[in-house]
Amino acid sequence: MLGFTINKPDVEGVFIKRINRFLGIGLINGVESLVHIHDPGRLKELLKPGIKFYAYHKDSGKTRFYLTAVDLGNELVLINSAIHNNVAAWLIENGLILKGYEVLRREPRFSGGRFDLMLKSPKGGYTMVEVKGVTLEEDGVAKFPDAPTLRGARHMIKLAKAIEEGYEAYVIFLVLRSNALLFTPNVSLDPRFSNALKYAIEHGVKVLAYKLALTRDWVLLPMGRVNVIL
């Protein structure tokens, strides 16, 4: 249980610019190429012109490259929200968070939508979980979100509804910046999400933040829980 291993990227490039939410342009082997970005955040402090990135080569689709991490020199930062649920499930299954809980289902249906995970608690009840990846860090403080997210706010309200219907509920923030010491909601950027999170907590939803560091061997090392400041 050293860490969560991700597939080693097979492409290196230099980022040029972001076109839209899921597309960017990078210089790969001297050629400007479209790159898929699987993260809805703004990522302005990460996806800067000239930054080195790592990606996977794709054999099909509109874009032939799938960005997965950026190199800040002193740390690699994962930019791939597609694996966040798997990382959270791994932490749970290895007893690093929510010890004694069992992962029953990925993307369980609830109230016309889906949560990220459904767990079975040590007491036999059921727990709904939302997972959020955190890539924004300022002066040792990790913040979420880095762009306004109506969808994220709705998730918090639905977690509160799950409590009302007899479930236990958690929101897990995966802090993906190695220098982060604390986590806090990004109130100034997205007060709507922050208010929704507070509403969820008032209704019994529990919050935890856990830090992981990406090594140059492409392993996410568990670094432990970080304090949550609301």
UniProtKB/Swiss-Prot annotation:
The lineage of its organism: Archaea, Thermoproteota, Thermoprotei, Thermoproteales, Thermoproteaceae. InterPro entries: SfsA, SfsA_C, SfsA_N. It comes from Caldivirga maquilingensis (strain ATCC 700844 / DSM 13496 / JCM 10307 / IC-167). It comes from the Archaea. Gene3D superfamilies: 2.40.50.580, 3.40.1350.60. Belongs to the SfsA family. This is Sugar fermentation stimulation protein homolog. The gene is sfsA. GO terms for molecular function: DNA binding. PANTHER family: SUGAR FERMENTATION STIMULATION PROTEIN A. Signal peptide: none annotated.
